[in-house]
Regions:
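Cysteine-centered catalytic environments shared across enzyme families
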Residues: 1-285
């Protein structure tokens, strides 16, 4: 479990707000007691609290990757290309379970790697796939990636919302974090309870209307959604939904398929460079 925080403001130089970023990040120490990191430029501030699981030296965050590539100009009967140079910066909480498959695809397309952490694989997958990266991920995650050339922030949350991600707007600043208490460290963000959110908390809690919280003007990025924030504003889009399909396997095929999926899931989730353990509950016989 790690923690991420950050904010974007196109009308102010946020590099002056380092102490604000540090205060926000310090509220998440329980999520990442091993290490912290900061990335601050004119319009972007990113921070990370790390719980080390994989690649202690190679997985430091926020992680920066420089990229130069040529992009074909999307115009009929044109052979022109745009030379694109940018720094991509990621702050990420989670674990990607299909890193081997992603890494193989990236290496086949000319990417090289400095370590074996999933952070680097995720960041380079975004550089390769763009916003469609979420369609290629198997895992639990909440992450933010800054494109310095576009001056654009991309955020995404996993399919079922295992990893949390909250956001708000305050005085031209877009502010986000793994926990709401970090957002409250940003000057001017008020702790005003939302009557509908409180009603849901006592009436149907812990269930709630997706995207809402118990505080006014503080929202969660919904599961299976990504968000893009740039000078034009905030755009949020759903990238996946659970489909109901006819079940065509017989009993024995179903048992074999379920056993395979269960073992595959466990194997993928037991990747670690530090000692690990698990809690078991009843239900499987």
């Amino acid at each position: 479990m790690c923690g991420i925080v950050g904010f974007v403001n196109y009308k102010q130089d946020v590099s002056r707000f380092r102490n604000i970023l540090i205060n926000m990040n310090n509220t998440l120490v329980r999520r990442g007691p091993d290490e912290d990191g900061y990335y601050i430029r004119k319009h972007i501030a990113l921070a990370h609290k790390r719980l080390i699981v994989i690649d202690p030296e190679g997985g430091k965050q926020p992680m920066v990757e420089s990229c130069s590539k040529s992009i074909p100009l999307q115009k009929e009967n044109s052979d022109m290309v745009i030379n694109y140079n940018s720094n991509f910066v990621i702050s990420y909480n989670g674990q990607i379970y299909n890193t081997d498959e992603l890494r193989k695809t990236l290496e086949e397309n000319g990417f090289t790697f400095n370590g074996h952490c999933d952070t680097e694989i995720l960041l380079k997958s975004y550089i390769f796939y763009g916003k469609n990266v979420v369609k290629h991920l198997n895992g639990i995650y909440a992450f933010a990636i800054w494109d310095s050339q576009k001056e654009e922030l991309f955020m995404a949350r996993d399919h079922f919302g295992v990893k949390p991600l909250f956001y708000t707007m305050q005085s031209n600043s877009f502010i986000f974090a793994s926990e709401i208490k970090a957002i409250f460290q940003y000057p001017g963000v008020e702790k005003i309870l939302d009557s509908q959110g409180i009603s849901e908390l006592f009436g149907i809690g812990p269930a709630h209307t997706p995207g809402t919280t118990i505080f006014n003007n503080i929202f969660e990025l919904k599961p299976a959604h990504y968000a893009i924030f740039n000078r034009y504003g905030l755009h949020i889009e759903k990238y996946w939904s659970l489909k109901s399909l006819p079940h065509e396997e017989n009993f024995n095929q179903t048992c074999e398929h379920l056993e395979y999926l269960l073992k595959d899931s466990i194997t993928r989730q037991l990747v670690s460079d530090v000692p690990l353990c698990t809690f078991l509950s009843g239900g499987l016989y």
